[in-house]
Amino acid sequence: MELKFSCRGNVIALSFNENDTVLDAKEKLGQEIDVSPSLIKLLYKGNLSDDSHLQDVVKNESKIMCLIRQDKDIVNQAISQLKVPDYSTNTYSLKPKKPHTTPKPASIYTFNELVVLDYPHKDRALRYLERLRDDTGIKKIMDSHRWTVPLLSEMDPAEHTRHDSKTLGLNHNQGAHIELRLRTDRYDGFRDYKTVKSTLIHELTHNVHGEHDSSFWELFRQLTKEADAADLLGKPGSYVSDRASYTPQQDNDDEDQKNHRRDLLLAAAERRKQSGSKVQKE
């Protein structure tokens, strides 16, 4: 059995026997990347348990997402070295206390885990995903439709770019894992936020509809309107006859935004082509 592991921005191909378990895969992969198997987490349509046989949970030549946990000992050591300020001798001015408010509980309908590529500016990429996760419109969609996505990750542009097309996002197993292209094609920056947000709404639509048929586009437009309405409520606006009006600003100089529709259609055509080739092989 041949398997590919996407780990830290690299793809590692390894061979296994039919009776090998997920734990065997972690041990073999750990030797390749010099990481303890206990710190490795493997995802393929969800988390893979150590005692499962590979042939029962993955297909030959499957691509598996690899996540590396931080060593707890290293984290605890770093925390222990932090200096705690001594407030015992400080004098404070008396100020009225702020009213106590109970924070609103976090919604269970969200993206449980965010993963970025091991490229420069990882912190910016992570903040980008956090901004999408916490976006008012996206949160409204997730809550309204009761969607929970276990993993939202950054897509590697190098793996999904051809001379005639590029994939902006992928939805694996109807919402088990969503990938988004965050970086520009030249890796010199990040793509327009409104474009990536629209791509995320596009991929969330695939939680319900796999094909780009009329039902898909109807739901996509509905979700976009829901997100826009939620964004409007969170922004100051002008009201006429007790109704707010909000039109997203269009930037004619933004090449990503201008070509977003074209890119989505190209990505859809590519998926149909890949789907057709699989049917012919079978």
From Swiss-Prot:
> What general EC class does the enzyme of this chain belong to?
hydrolase
Active-site positions, per UniProt? E203
Ubiquitin-like domain span: 1-75
Quick check: keyword Acetylation in the entry? no
What GO cellular component term, any one, is given?
Answer: nucleus
Where found, per UniProt? Cytoplasm; Nucleus
List, separated by semicolons, the cofactors it needs: Zn(2+)
Where is the stretch described as Disordered? Answer: 234-282
- Residues annotated as binding Zn(2+): H202, H206, H212
Q: Where is the WLM domain?
A: 99-274
Ranges of Basic and acidic residues composition bias in the record: 269-282
Q: Name one GO molecular function term.
A: transition metal ion binding
Alphabetical keyword list: Cytoplasm, DNA damage, DNA repair, Hydrolase, Metal-binding, Metalloprotease, Nucleus, Protease, Zinc
Entry's PROSITE patterns? UBIQUITIN_2, WLM, ZINC_PROTEASE
Set out the biological process GO terms recorded for this chain's protein. Answer: DNA repair; protein sumoylation; proteolysis
Query: Which EC number(s) are documented for this chain?
Result: 3.4.24.-
Role this protein plays: Metalloendopeptidase that acts selectively on DNA-binding proteins. DNA is needed to bring the protease and substrates together to enable proteolysis. Involved in the repair of toxic DNA-protein cross-links (DPCs) such as covalently trapped topoisomerase 1 (TOP1) adducts on DNA lesions or DPCs induced by reactive compounds such as formaldehyde.
What the record says about family reads: Belongs to the peptidase M3 family. WSS1-like metalloprotease (WLM) subfamily.
Output this protein's name.
DNA-dependent metalloprotease WSS1 homolog 2
**Native organism taxonomy:** Eukaryota, Fungi, Dikarya, Ascomycota, Taphrinomycotina
In the UniProt record, what gene is named as encoding this protein? wss2
